Regions:
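Conserved phosphate/anionic-ligand binding catalytic regions in large, soluble enzymes, centered on
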Residues: 31-39, 80, 184-206, 305-317, ...
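Short amphipathic, charge-patterned alpha-helical segments
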Residues: 244-246, 396-411
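Ferredoxin-type iron-sulfur electron-transfer modules in oxidoreductases and energy-metabolism complexes
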Residues: 2-25, 41-70, 83, 88-121, ...
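Gly-rich Lys/Arg/Thr-decorated short loops/hinges at beta-loop-alpha junctions or inter-strand turns
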Residues: 150-166, 218-230, 333-338, 380-385, ...
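C-terminal accessory/binding modules appended to enzymatic or scaffolding proteins
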Residues: 375-387, 393-395, 399, 557-601, ...
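Hydrophobic alpha-helical positions that pack around
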Residues: 140, 269-395, 407
Length: 623
C-alpha cells in the first residue's frame, strides 16, 4: 500500500498500533552488533521457537493462550551486559540472557506474568527490574536513540507506529524548502560528526547555489576506534536517519542521496537496504513522495574502512570511485562536492535529529543542551568503567556525571586518570576537567575535540605515553599520504614515541615531539591531519612527568610498557609447582620442584605468561 497523504500515514499508524496492542506480550531481543556477538541470535531463535509453540496451542498451562510477538530491536544501551531482552507490557529488562534461560522466561514471565529476578540488572545491592530503574538508562535524554531498543529494527511499520514519517508529511504538506532550512537554522543544530558546523547554514549554502543538480550525502563511516554511535543508529532505527535525509533533500532540491557506510558494518548495510526498500514500497522514498511531486532516490555506498574517508572531500571522492584523498579547499563540498555538484554532507546523528526538530519545533530543541550547542549528543562509553555502552545526554553534561552517575564509576574502585574524547583525533582530559561541560566550544578550549563521540575512560593502570603511541600508530597508518606534514610528520612522531616506550628516549625528544606536533597541526591539508597530533599534545601537556619518567628513570608507573617491566617471583608465595617455567617460551625461569623459582631478566622477553599462569600470585611486576 502506497501512502499518499498525511491521512494515509495516520491510518497506517493506527492500524499498526492495533496490531501491536493485540499481543499479550512482546519480547524485545536486542539485536545490535554487540548483543549478536554475545549470542543474541540464539536467544531470538529459541524465544521464537518457544513462543510459536504457545501460539500453536501446544501449551496446556492455561486456557487463554497468549499471543506473543518476538522482535529484533536495535541496541538497548547496556552493551557490556548482553544479550539483553525486554518484555512488554511488564517492562522487565533482562541482562546476560542465555539460551537455557528462555524456557524459564516463557514459563514464568510470558505465561504467568512473573519476573525471572536473577536476570535483572543490579546496581550494587539494588535490584532494577525496569529500564527506568537503571541509573545508566534513566539519566539519559534520548532524541536520536529514542526508538532504539523499542521498535523492530527491520519494520518500517513499527517506525510509523511511533510517529515515524510525520515530520516528512508535515514538510511536504505545509512547509516550503526555505521554511525547513529556517527551522533547522533556528534550532541551532550543529553537525554531530566532529566539526560542529551549523547544519542549517550548510543547507542554506547548498540551496542558493546556481547549479540545480544537488546531492545529499550521509557520512556513516565512523572510523574512530571504539566508536559505535552511528552504527547503532543505522542498525536500530535506520528510518529516522532516512527521514531526516529526505527532509534535507526537499529543503535543498536534491533528487539523489548517498549513504556512505563502511563495509565493516554489515548489519547496518543490511538494515539500511531493508529500510530503503520498505520506504520505497510505501511511497515515502523514490518518485512522487507522498504524492507531492518530489523525488528522492537513496543509494548505499560501502567504504573500504579507510579512516581518512571520514573527511568530506575524501568521502565524496570514494563514492565517485576514486582514491579517498582530501583536496585543497575552497571550493568546499557545499559548492563542489559529489561529482562537482553542491552537496549537503552530514553524519548519521545529525540527520536523525531533523524529524524531531520539524515536529517539535526549533524552540523546543533549544531548551535542551547549551546556548551554543543545543540538543543532545550520543557517546560510546568504553574503557575502565563499570557500565560500558551507548548513551545520549544533553550537550553541556559534565564528564563527572557521565562517568560516575551514568557509567557507575571506574572498575574495581581504581583511581581515575583521564578520558580520551574524540578518538585518535581528540585529546585527553584529566581529573581537574571532570566538571567541564561537554559541548563543542567548551571541549575545544581544553585542547580536544568532541569528535564523533567516543569516550574512553582510563584509570591509574593506563600508561599515557602508550596511549599517545597507540593513537599515533593508528593515525600514521591511516594517513592517506597526500601531504608531507601528515605523512612524514606522524611517522617521525611515532618513531619518537616508540623509542620512548622502549626505554631508549632522550629528553630532547620531548621538544622535538612538540615541534613536530605543532607543524602537523598547522600545515596538514585536511582536518584529520590537523587533529592527528592532539593526543600527543594533550598528554604532553597534562602528563609530561610520565614522559620524563620513561626517559630519565626508564620507568613506566603503570607497568604497561613491556621494555620497562621486570618480572620477579616472590619466594614467600611460590610453592615450587613449576607451572611458570613450563609456560615460559624463553626458558628464563629456573628452579626445583617444591622450592621457589627464579626469573632471569636478561633472558626474559616480558611476555607475562608466567604471571598469567601462576595460581598463587607469586609473580609480580616491577617497573
Amino acid at each position: 500500500m502506497s501512502i499518499k497523504s498525511k491521512e494515509d500515514l495516520l491510518n497506517k499508524q493506527a492500524e499498526v498500533n492495533e496490531q501491536i496492542k493485540s499481543y499479550t506480550c512482546r519480547v524485545l531481543v536486542c539485536s545490535g552488533t554487540g548483543c549478536i556477538a554475545s549470542g543474541a541470535q540464539k536467544i531470538y531463535d529459541e524465544m521464537a521457537t518457544l513462543c510459536e509453540r504457545i501460539d500453536g496451542v501446544t501449551v496446556e498451562m492455561q486456557k487463554d493462550v497468549p499471543h506473543v510477538g518476538v522482535v529484533k530491536t536495535g541496541c538497548q544501551g547496556l552493551c557490556e551486559l548482553g544479550p539483553l531482552m525486554r518484555i512488554e507490557p511488564y517492562d522487565y529488562q533482562y541482562v546476560h540472557v542465555q539460551p537455557e534461560d528462555c524456557k524459564e522466561i516463557v514459563e514464568r514471565t510470558i505465561l504467568e506474568g512473573k519476573p525471572v529476578e536473577r536476570l535483572f540488572y543490579r546496581d550494587n545491592d539494588t535490584v532494577c527490574p525496569h529500564p527506568d530503574d537503571i541509573p545508566f538508562l534513566n539519566q539519559q535524554t534520548r532524541i536520536v536513540l529514542e526508538n532504539c531498543g523499542k521498535i523492530d529494527a527491520e519494520s518500517i511499520e513499527e517506525y510509523i507506529a511511533v510517529g515515524g514519517y510525520q515530520a516528512l508529511a508535515k514538510v511536504m504538506g505545509s512547509m516550503s524548502p526555505q521554511e525547513v532550512i529556517d527551522e533547522v537554522t533556528k534550532s541551532g543544530l550543529r553537525g554531530r560528526g566532529g566539526a560542529g558546523f551549523p547544519a542549517g547554514k550548510k543547507w542554506s549554502q547548498v540551496a542558493r547555489q546556481a547549479e540545480k543538480t544537488r546531492y545529499v550525502v550521509c557520512n556513516g563511516d565512523e572510523g574512530d576506534p571504539g566508536a559505535f554511535m552511528d552504527g547503532s543508529v543505522m542498525e536500530g532505527d535506520p528510518y529516522k536517519m532516512i527521514e531526516g535525509m529526505t527532509i534535507a533533500a526537499y529543503a535543498v532540491g536534491a533528487e539523489n542521496g548517498y549513504i556512505y557506510v563502511r563495509a565493516e558494518y554489515p548489519l547496518s548495510v543490511k538494515r539500511l537496504r531493508m529500510a530503503i526498500e520498505q520506504a520505497e514500497k510505501y511511497g515515502l522514498l523514490g518518485d512522487n513522495i507522498l504524492n507531492s511531486g518530489v523525488n528522492f532516490h537513496l543509494h548505499i555506498n560501502r567504504g573500504a574502512g579507510a579512516f581518512v574517508c571520514g573527511e568530506g572531500s575524501a568521502l565524496t571522492a570514494s563514492i565517485e570511485g576514486n582514491r579517498g584523498m582530501p583536496r585543497v579547499k575552497p571550493p568546499r563540498t557545499v559548492e563542489k562536492g559529489l561529482w562537482g555538484k553542491p552537496t549537503v554532507l552530514n553524519n548519521v546523528e545529525t540527520y536523525a535529529n531533523v524529524p524531531k526538530i520539524i515536529l517539535q519545533g526549533a524552540d523546543w530543541f533549544r531548551t535542551i543542551g547549551t546556548e551554543g550547542s543545543p540538543g543532545t549528543k550520543t557517546f560510546s562509553l568504553t574503557g575502565s568503567i563499570e557500565n560500558t555502552g551507548l548513551i545520549e545526554v544533553p550537550m553541556g553534561t559534565t564528564l563527572r556525571h557521565i562517568i560516575y552517575d551514568i557509567g557507575g564509576g571506574l572498575k574495581s574502585g581504581a583511581a581515575f586518570k583521564g578520558v580520551q574524547i574524540g578518538g585518535p583525533s581528540g585529546g585527553c582530559l584529566i581529573l581537574d576537567q571532570l566538571d567541564a561541560p561537554l559541548d563543542f566550544d567548551s571541549v575545544k578550549k581544553l585542547d580536544a575535540i568532541m569528535g564523533s563521540g567516543g569516550l574512553v575512560v582510563m584509570d591509574e593502570n593506563t600508561c599515557m605515553v602508550e596511549v599517545a603511541r597507540f593513537f599515533m600508530n593508528f593515525t600514521q597508518r591511516e594517513s592517506c599520504g597526500k601531504c608531507v606534514p601528515c605523512r612524514e610528520g606522524t611517522k617521525r612522531m611515532l618513531e619518537i614515541l616508540e623509542r620512548i616506550v622502549d626505554g631508549k628516549g632522550e629528553m630532547s625528544d620531548l621538544d622535538e615531539l612538540e615541534e613536530l606536533a605543532n607543524m602537523v597541526q598547522n600545515m596538514a591539508l585536511c582536518g584529520l591531519g590537523k587533529s592527528a597530533p592532539l593526543p600527543v599534545i594533550s598528554t604532553l601537556k597534562r602528563f609530561r612527568d610520565e614522559y620524563e619518567e620513561h626517559i630519565r628513570d626508564k620507568k613506566c608507573r603503570a607497568k604497561v610498557c613491556t621494555a620497562l617491566r621486570q618480572f620477579h617471583i616472590n619466594p614467600e608465595f611460590c610453592i615450587g609447582c613449576g607451572k611458570c617455567a613450563k609456560n615460559c617460551p624463553a626458558g628464563a625461569i629456573s628452579g626445583k620442584i617444591k622450592h621457589p623459582y627464579h626469573i632471569d631478566n636478561d633472558i626474559c622477553i616480558k611476555c607475562g605468561a608466567c604471571k598469567d599462569n601462576c595460581n598463587f600470585d607469586a609473580v609480580y611486576v616491577e617497573a
